[in-house]
């Protein structure tokens, strides 16, 4: 079984099984330089012993120049416990600021 998580789930706690896939889908527009990153400006899991991450960007169906698409993070929980997945929408060369958009979902793995 897998779980689909969107921006509407910000701050939510999901109960998942160890080894289960959670797909986080967030609006993104890399043509502006912005994308979703973990703390430290990385696309990789900040804690590989707790969960692994694969990341992919899907462009929009629109032909409009500069239209945003969707960034997908496939998160697989590797250990029991509650794990926070924290993402920040930012430009990697400037880092997060006080007004950066943030997304957090808590994965409670049994």
From Swiss-Prot:
Keyword match Lipoprotein: no
Major subcellular location class: other
Motif (BC loop): 29-34
Motif (FG loop): 91-100
Places the protein is found: Flagellar pocket; Cytoplasmic vesicle; Cell surface
PANTHER family xref list: AMOEBIASIN-1, INHIBITOR OF CYSTEINE PEPTIDASE
Protein name: Chagasin
GO molecular function (one): cysteine-type endopeptidase inhibitor activity
Keywords annotated in UniProt: Cytoplasmic vesicle, Protease inhibitor, Thiol protease inhibitor
Assembly and binders: Interacts with cruzipain.
